[in-house]
A protein has these predicted regions:
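ATP/NTP-dependent adenylation/nucleotidyl-transfer catalytic domains that generate, transfer
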Residues: 16, 32, 171, 228-230, ...
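Enzyme catalytic cores with a strong preference for nitrogen-chemistry domains
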Residues: 1-370, 386-395, 427
Length: 682
């Protein structure tokens, strides 16, 4: 991959789509053709691959019996020829609504046009005939039209509901069209098309507006995109349609796998477009992982096996078009306050319920936990406290130790004691430094002779002793050791293996990424899970630098200065674990999410001082670190990880669950992909 096209969305598995609405002139196909071409030219300049227009946009949806007038139908065909001719030098595939004569009926059609030719024509399957709708008076039912052709512009073109349109030069871009009512039936044509391979489902809609119908449309579009693991592009008729008995709002929107990517203002006065970049890689990956999707295709192969595919070349631009979709800086932490609060409520209670069930299943032992005053052990402790509350047990059944070492600060130790005291757990302090000195002396470590050697052995002696003490204390007191290590540390292998923080009897934090941890604790404070004193202590802990506190010195020993920003590592982890994306694509996404601290939304209450930006060289640097540690180093630690609940839809790293990988693999394929492009400049 060269620096020239690294910035192109089409090099990273995206395709730009647009749902277009504008002013319709009823019964004036030539005027409407010019509106379509005006939109098409704008979409061409915007790098759009697929532009979708409303139902019967060339004449207006609301013209009733005028649909049976030859003069009008003649003009529709002539206007369509104008659109075809005008598209010759333009990029987008145009999906245009028009009434067309075929055999003995008039059909309500989606005409697929690209670069001066008609690729195919799809008739509406289910013209409605209830309430305000009376389409069957004029329009034929196209549901059984399969394998046919239609004469259009002097040529024979494919005609039927069994048509897919595939871009040969954009992997994964496979288009299917359905019309308005088609998506309201129990088994819509788009469902079969998705099983047959369509990834971009489009709906040309008339759909007069009534109170509440907008939300119904959104529900159906969201559901279709989620069930079909597809993009769903919807364009409804708007201004200019007849208001004899109805009104129109011109709603346009783009969904992808259940997520709203773009929508227009309703009741627009002029041209309006909902434009978004749909992620074809994401859709492909989700379908591959969800094996039942293809199982369902096989069940329905009698219907899905005979779809016809019309191939075309899009010839997408290699230029930098930006990225037209919202990206979360923190994929595990939504910026929307309501969604974040809901996620935190669910995550916390998943952890609490997981621990409560485990304790009940093994006879109700006490819980032994080491409390450092840092985020992870703090959160594990408040999970344990709530689990005891739910089980009707005293919090004194939690046996909490703070185990200070050579570099433990007074600040973190004081916070640990305050938290244990305010929660009412059984608290104690056990200083590990005498035992650590003895062990280092017996090992003939230079530190024992007074030399300031703070190597990995020095660090792991402390980490190992803490865990060793906790396990022996659990033996002595009839308890289990509660693990505190989080999902991000598991990904990077940032733990001491065996007799160290990698091991416990049960780990409530193993499914929680580091970037979510602080928000969980903030939610615990704001939702009043504990008293005010506990809340104040939790707030003080949130302000503490992330550090293992293993090396003596004047400055706080920051984990992130060594291993990299957890913000970037969690961004990478989400896209590797959930979607299997290439490192080069993750770099592209991370740059768009992180290069400008002032752009986009931050999670609520995120500290201003920590709202930083990252340039591409820094993103690549830490991506390489992640790839080396995740793929080539850390799996042996994950292969032996304790039980713990999955928390996020982003995935878990349990070898019994979401991530099953060999412990002796390597990172070469991922590092080669990351090296495919020279260092581009934005």
């Amino acid at each position: 991959m060269s620096a020239t096209n690294f910035w192109s969305i089409y090099q990273h598995g995206f395709a730009r789509v647009a749902a277009c609405t504008g002013h319709t002139v009823i019964a004036d196909p030539r005027a409407n053709a010019e509106t379509v071409l005006r939109h098409a030219r704008r979409c061409d300049g915007d790098g759009v691959a697929v532009a979708v227009f409303p139902e019967m946009v060339l004449c207006g949806y609301s013209i009733e019996d005028l649909l049976l007038q030859d003069a009008l139908l003649d003009e529709v065909e002539e206007a369509l020829e104008d659109v075809v001719a005008g598209s010759a030098g333009l990029l987008p595939v145009l999906v245009v609504g028009a009434p067309l004569r075929h055999r003995n009926r008039v059909y309500n059609c989606a005409v697929i046009v690209h670069r001066g030719r008609v690729l195919g024509v799809v008739p509406k399957s289910y013209p409605p005939n209830y309430r305000e709708f009376y389409e069957r008076r004029q329009i034929g039912d196209g549901a059984d039209e399969r394998g046919g052709s239609i004469r259009l512009g002097g040529a024979s073109v494919p005609f039927g509901v069994d048509l897919l349109f595939a871009a040969e030069d954009v992997p994964g871009l496979v288009l299917h069209a359905e019309i308005c009512e088609d998506m309201w039936v129990p088994v819509p044509p788009s469902a079969e098309a998705a099983l047959a391979g369509a990834t971009v489902l489009v709906n040309l809609s008339g759909s007069p507006i009534t109170v509440g119908r907008s939300e119904d449309r959104k529900l159906l579009c969201r559901s279709a995109s989620s069930r079909c693991i597809a993009a769903y592009v919807y364009a409804a008729a708007g201004l200019g349609e007849s208001t004899t008995d109805l009104s129109w709002d011109g709603q346009a929107m783009v969904y992808e796998n259940g997520l709203l990517l773009a929508e227009t203002e309703r009741f627009p006065l002029g041209d309006s477009q909902a434009v978004a970049d749909v992620d074809l890689d994401l859709l492909r990956q989700e379908r591959q992982r969800m094996g039942t999707f293809d199982d369902n295709r096989r069940t329905h192969r009698a219907r899905t096996g005979d779809f016809r595919t019309v191939a075309f070349e899009l010839d997408p631009p290699a230029a930098d078009l930006g990225l037209r979709r919202r990206l979360e800086r923190f994929p595990f932490v939504p910026a929307d306050p309501g969604r974040l609060a809901q996620d935190c409520y669910e995550a916390y209670n998943i952890q609490v319920a997981g621990l409560q069930q485990r304790l009940a299943a093994i006879g109700g032992p006490k819980v032994v936990i080491g409390v450092s005053g840092g985020l992870d052990s703090t959160h594990a402790l408040i999970v344990a406290a709530r689990a005891m509350d739910r089980a009707g047990r005293p919090r004194s059944d939690i046996l909490a130790w703070t185990l200070p070492g050579f570099a433990t600060s007074d600040h973190t130790k004081d916070n640990a004691h305050k938290l244990m005291r305010s929660l009412g757990v059984t608290a104690a302090e056990l200083d590990i430094t005498p035992t650590a000195r003895l062990m280092l002396k017996e090992m003939d470590h230079p530190f024992a002779a007074g030399e300031p050697v703070y190597d990995v052995t020095f660090e792991n002696v402390q980490a190992g002793l803490r865990t060793d003490y906790l396990f022996r204390l659990a033996n002595q007191r009839g308890g289990i050791v509660l693990g505190t290590g989080d999902l991000s540390e598991l990904a990077l292998g940032w733990s001491t293996y065996g007799v160290g923080d990698q091991m416990s009897h049960y780990n409530v934090n193993s499914g929680v990424p580091k970037t979510l941890m602080q928000h969980l604790i903030r939610w615990v404070i704001s939702s009043g899970q504990f008293d005010e004193e506990t809340g104040r202590t939790l707030a003080a802990i949130l302000d503490t630098e992330i550090s293992p506190e293993l090396v003596p010195g004047e400055e706080m020993q920051s984990t992130e200065s060594k291993i990299g920003p957890y913000a970037l590592h969690d961004f990478t982890l989400f896209h590797v674990l959930r979607f299997g994306f290439r490192p080069s694509k993750i770099a592209f996404l991370a740059w768009h999410a992180w290069h400008d601290a002032d752009a986009g939304d931050w999670p609520p209450n995120f500290p201003e001082a920590k709202r930083v930006a990252y340039d591409l060289p820094e993103i690549r640097r830490w991506l390489e670190v992640f790839c080396r540690r995740f793929f080539a180093f850390a799996q042996f630690k994950r292969s032996a990880m304790p039980n713990g609940p999955k928390v996020s839809a982003g995935g878990s790293l349990s070898p019994r669950g979401d991530w099953r990988a060999p412990s002796d693999s390597n990172a070469r394929a991922w590092l080669r992909d990351l090296a495919r492009f020279d260092e581009p400049t934005a």
